[in-house]
Regions:
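Conserved Walker A/P-loop ATP-binding site and its immediately adjacent core
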Residues: 121, 130-155, 329-334
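Walker A/P-loop
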Residues: 107-128
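Conserved RecA-like P-loop NTPase helicase motor core
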Residues: 354-444
Length: 543
């Protein structure tokens, strides 16, 4: 009996061939838990990324191959060939050719990381059809992504037959060349062993989601001979990127960030208001900021929303070529924006939020002002005409969101991209998030200007030297002749530089007026919003 075999359930190794120390290592190493802040009050539950039968352990392919060595055999089916009549009609850009070559050299298993607008979907289709040529399955986590893959497949591979795996629907017969599967369906249903044997390739779109406990089950349910993960953001803040890397393999090709682009402008409005309805930081019993309540508070404060509209409306009138994407964490906030812009005479307004049908999303994509949630804009939004974005609620990581207005090539732009940012000065957390956004803007070479400064001044033109400039002499925060600079002092210097870069406060051109006091109403806050717990389906059905 062979000691180790690559199977559609994972790297299968005999228990009898393992020592007690090796078994202990498997169980310890492959039981993971997310990293959480020290202030996290919930329960962190570890979960396993391996399964076992009475005789074998089934382990993630890449991890086990590294730890135990190559398997004795590969029992994964090669998959059915695609019809010879199908032809990939796209033209690869140089970086896409490099990505495919790296994927091929890695044995058709690994992760490709490309920024927003660099053609991840295009590259994935080329890999499956042009490079491998076997029937393939694409796993997505949102329905609008499935629709985007469908449209791209039809455009690039005319005549391709596309099936779906969603809910009760399971199009995997020989009449389909490719199936697009919803990951929620894959993780919640038990499929008989061999169900997906006709597929030679699996593509996991937005693969970083597979680090989560529930979605990670997809890695154990669909395993093909060729496995490709696509993402723009492979690093998870909870430290669980290793979960999908253990199954798919390492990152084989990555463009971490776009080249610096000083044509992208950042306009920052400093919002100052001492109304306690807005300015009092919500905290828990330990005095820690409750972020969800803080976002609710900021989004619900209508004078702030009105100030933003008053700031932006003249720009849209003066520059009719601007196409604006407004992002918020709260749908009610977007509705307030829609009402206020309509009152200003803007009629071309559309929503881009979860739950909308693709036809309605396509209609919204034609509007001058698009109101969307961060969740929808973080992945898959493809509206090349967008050139302006308003970050209406504070966030730290905005790279994916900003990428939505940078899909056009620099030489093809008719309007320079513009990011509209807002600094909520009342909150320490918001100031910290601004520091991270500013660091991102600086790393991208964007020009930062404040709304209450003269138009011809900016951070870069005010004499600040770039961090990459060798001659930039920085005054240390502390001087210690006996000790080298530490990471701590470097971080403190960055904070001081960020605070120093914020211009001294002058009465802003736009300032909220304190609303008339309203009758006091009893507020009811339920800190525990109950959710339904999903019943886990068995991984496999065996006779």
């Amino acid at each position: 009996m062979q000691r180790a075999i690559q199977t559609t359930r994972g790297y299968a190794i005999l228990k009898s061939a393992l020592s007690a120390a090796q078994i202990s290592h498997i169980q310890k190493e492959l039981t993971v838990a997310p990293n959480v802040p020290l202030s996290y009050a919930g329960t962190v539950t570890p979960f396993k990324v391996w399964v076992e039968s009475s005789t074998r352990y089934y382990l993630p392919h890449a991890w086990a191959s590294t730890y135990f060595g190559p398997a004795d055999a590969d029992a994964r089916p090669p998959g059915d060939s695609l019809p010879s009549t199908l032809e990939f009609k796209g033209t690869l850009r140089p970086h896409q050719e490099e990505a495919l070559a790296a994927f091929r050299d890695a044995g058709h298993s690994g992760i490709i990381c490309l920024p927003c607008g660099y053609g991840k979907t295009f590259t994935g289709i080329a890999a499956a059809t042009q490079l491998i040529g076997r029937r393939f399955i694409i796993v997505v986590h949102k329905e609008f992504l499935a629709d985007q893959w469908t449209a791209e497949l039809r455009a690039l591979v005319p005549g391709i037959r596309i099936g779906r795996i969603q809910g009760e629907r399971c199009d995997i017969g020989p009449q389909f060349d490719v199936a697009i599967a919803m990951i929620q369906t894959i993780c919640s249903r038990a499929y008989p062993i061999g169900t997906f044997d006709s597929f030679g390739t699996v593509i996991f779109d937005e693969v970083h989601h597979l680090g989560a406990e529930h979605f990670s089950q997809a890695l154990q349910r669909i395993q093909c001979r060729n496995m490709l993960g696509l993402t723009a953001t492979p690093n998870r803040v909870d430290g669980l990127s290793k979960v999908f890397e253990w199954s798919l393999g390492r990152i084989v090709y990555q463009i971490a960030r776009r080249p610096k682009d000083d044509s992208v402008g950042v306009r920052v409005m400093r919002y100052v208001c001492d109304d306690p309805v807005y300015a009092n930081t919500p905290t828990n019993w330990r005095g820690e900021t409750v972020r969800a309540r803080l976002i609710n508070q900021i989004a619900a404060f209508k004078p702030r929303t009105s100030a933003l509209v008053e700031w932006i409306a003249p720009m849209l009138r003066d520059e009719p070529g601007r196409r604006l994407l407004i992002l918020s964490d709260r749908r009610e906030h977007l509705m307030d924006f829609a009402t206020l812009f309509a009152a200003q005479g803007f009629a071309s307004i559309g929503y881009y939020v979860g739950g909308m049908k693709q036809a309605d999303l396509d209609m919204s994509a034609t509007k001058q002002i698009i109101l969307g949630t961060y969740a929808m804009a973080s992945e898959g939004m493809n509206i090349p005409t967008l050139n302006t974005i308003l970050l209406a609620t504070p966030k730290s990581n905005i790279e994916q969101s900003v990428g939505r207005i940078l899909r056009q090539k620099k030489e093809e732009r008719l309007v320079a991209p513009r990011i509209l940012d807002i600094l909520d000065t009342a909150f320490m957390e918001a100031n910290g998030q601004w520091a991270k956004r500013r660091k991102f803007y600086k790393s991208c070479g964007y020009t930062i200007k404040w709304s209450d400064e003269p138009e011809n001044t900016s951070e870069s033109s005010a004499g600040e030297m770039d961090e990459d400039t060798p001659t930039a002499a920085k005054t240390p925060l502390f001087v210690d002749d006996d000790a080298p600079p530490t990471a701590c002092s470097k971080e403190l210097n960055e904070i001081v530089e960020t605070l120093a870069s914020i211009p001294p406060y002058e009465p802003p051109t736009i300032k909220s007026t304190k609303p008339k006091p309203k009758p006091k109403a009893k507020r009811i806050y339920n800190p525990k919003d109950p959710t339904l717990s999903a019943t886990k389906a068995p991984l496999f059905i065996e006779d």
